[in-house]
C-alpha cells in the first residue's frame, strides 16, 4: 500500500472517530444563546444532581441600575463576564470572583426620553471589542480589555424612528 493511501486512510479514520459537535459550550458563553446556533446548553459538569441542593452564590455584583431590571444574557469569554444595564452602562467582571475590571457609561442626552423604556438587551463580544446598542440608536464599540470607547455610529435618528 502506498504511503499516501495509508496517510489518507489514517486521516479518514481519525475524522470519523471524532465526536460530533453537540452544540454545548465550554466554560465560555460567547453568544446570546451560548453558541452561534443558540443551543443554550453548557457542557460544564460542576453542578449536577448530586450537589445541586448544596450550591450557594459564589459572588454578587450590584450595578446600581434598578429601573427595568436586567434583561440581558451575560456574555462570558476568556474568564471575563460582560453585562449591560438599562441605562447604557457596560461592566466587565472577573467571572470567577465578580471583581470589576472596567465600566463604561454611554452619555445619553439629558433631554432624551424613550417610548419603550430604558431596557438594554446586552452586548456582543468579538474581534477584541465589546459592542452595545444604545437607547438613542447608536452602536458603540469598546476595547475589550480597557472598556475605552473605540468608535460609535448613529444608526437612526431617535426622534425620527417612531421609537
Model-derived features: positions:
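Bacterial N-terminal signal peptides
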Residues: 5-15
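Blade/loop signatures of beta-propeller domains
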Residues: 21-57
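Extracytoplasmic beta-rich repeat domains
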Residues: 61-73, 103-124, 152-163
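Residue-level detector of Asp-centered blade-edge/turn motifs that repeat once per structural unit
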Residues: 76-78, 125-127
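Short loop/turn segments that connect beta-strands within beta-propeller blades
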Residues: 94-97, 143-146
Amino acid at each position: 500500500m502506498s504511503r499516501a493511501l495509508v496517510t489518507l486512510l489514517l486521516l479518514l479514520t481519525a475524522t470519523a472517530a471524532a465526536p460530533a459537535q453537540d452544540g454545548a459550550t465550554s466554560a465560555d458563553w460567547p453568544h446570546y444563546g451560548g453558541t452561534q446556533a443558540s443551543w443554550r446548553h453548557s457542557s460544564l459538569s460542576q453542578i449536577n444532581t448530586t450537589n445541586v441542593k448544596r450550591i450557594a452564590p459564589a459572588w454578587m455584583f450590584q450595578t446600581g441600575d434598578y429601573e427595568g431590571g436586567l434583561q440581558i444574557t451575560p456574555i462570558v469569554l476568556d474568564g471575563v463576564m460582560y453585562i449591560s444595564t438599562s441605562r447604557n452602562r457596560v461592566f466587565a467582571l472577573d467571572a470567577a470572583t465578580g471583581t470589576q475590571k472596567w465600566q463604561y457609561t454611554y452619555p445619553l442626552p439629558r433631554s432624551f426620553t424613550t417610548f419603550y423604556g430604558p431596557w438594554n438587551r446586552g452586548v456582543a463580544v468579538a474581534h477584541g471589542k465589546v459592542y452595545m446598542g444604545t437607547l438613542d440608536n447608536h452602536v458603540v464599540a469598546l476595547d475589550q480589555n480597557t472598556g475605552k470607547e473605540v468608535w460609535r455610529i448613529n444608526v437612526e435618528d431617535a426622534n425620527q424612528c417612531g421609537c
